[in-house]
Design a protein with these regions (language model features):
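Eukaryotic helix-grip
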Residues: 1-283
Length: 283
């Protein structure tokens, strides 16, 4: 991939369940059940406001979450370890309250940031998302997704029906997403994300897309596509899944040659780890 911040990996696997069952499993899968994936919290969203993120106060008291708290408490002076807009950086207000792994002022700050970004996404799609403020300039999530798709012609062609009918292709899209958020580990520091899951029937199968349109760390933007085809395994209905993961991240921009190949291999290992966990739950 010529896009310096982009990376793409592909994988395929069989789910021993009919397509509709597999689709439901993908839509409702909860990775927090698998400690090796290091997803600490995950919750559905309806856009009701900051209160939807109050479960941040129940985060585990591990070193990853502690690093996330410490990075937040350095705002607004030092935003270097978080991905925020220039306006968001200024919103943090230090205060008292230390119950739980994430203190109340930190919970309040992130609840506001996530709620505002969620509201913007629901009303305007990717184009409404504020740019990340970085040392090298502003990073716009919509432009990151467009660059990833441009460099992935096979995925862009295969998933064109889904892309054109969702926020991935611009605007709000005509297909309504399932919205959710997560708290997860990124190389020793926890991060929060906002995501939208889309699904659409195509032919005798289904296509899905899991769009990460905001991440406080780990990625600028990402999308995981799944093509689901009905197949038979030993006379039983099953699903053949082709998965394509496209990721834009700051850590990728300086990698070249062997280092970039190594990063691709590492990403594939993480994807395979997630697939194995999913297949265990799908039995």
């Amino acid at each position: 991939m010529r896009f310096s911040r982009g990376l793409s990996v592909e994988s395929a696997f069989i789910v021993r369940a009919p397509v509709k069952t597999t689709l439901g499993l993908l839509q409702n899968w909860n990775p927090t059940r698998h400690s090796e994936l290091k997803v600490y919290l995950s919750g559905d969203l309806s856009g009701r406001g900051p209160g939807e993120f109050q479960s941040l106060s129940t985060a585990p008291g591990n070193s990853s979450v502690k690093a996330f708290v410490e990075a937040t408490e350095k705002l607004p002076g030092d935003p270097s370890k978080l991905q925020l807009s220039a306006a968001e950086v200024k919103e943090f207000a230090p205060g008292s309250g230390s119950e739980g792994a994430i203190p109340a002022p930190v919970v309040t700050f992130w609840s506001q940031v996530l709620s505002q970004r969620l509201k913007s996404f629901v009303s305007g799609g990717l184009s409404s998302q504020p740019a990340y403020q970085t040392a090298g300039g502003n990073i716009v999530p919509e432009e990151e997704i467009a660059a990833l798709l441009k460099e992935s012609p096979s995925a862009r062609s295969q998933f064109a029906p889904l892309i054109s009918s969702t926020a991935i292709g611009g605007g709000r899209g005509s297909v309504s997403p399932n919205l959710y958020w997560q708290l997860f580990d990124v190389e020793g520091q926890a991060a929060v994300s906002l995501n939208a899951f889309y699904a659409r029937p195509v032919g005798d199968g289904w296509q899905t897309a899991d769009l990460g349109y905001y991440g406080s760390g780990g990625f600028y933007a990402l999308v995981s596509f799944h093509q689901l085809w009905p197949v038979q395994v030993n006379g039983t209905d099953a699903t053949l899944v082709w998965r394509v993961d496209l990721t834009s991240a700051s850590a990728l921009s300086e990698l070249r040659g062997v280092e970039r190949l190594g990063s691709g291999a590492a990403m594939m290992r993480e994807v395979q780890k997630g697939i194995k966990a999913f297949l265990r739950d799908a039995r």
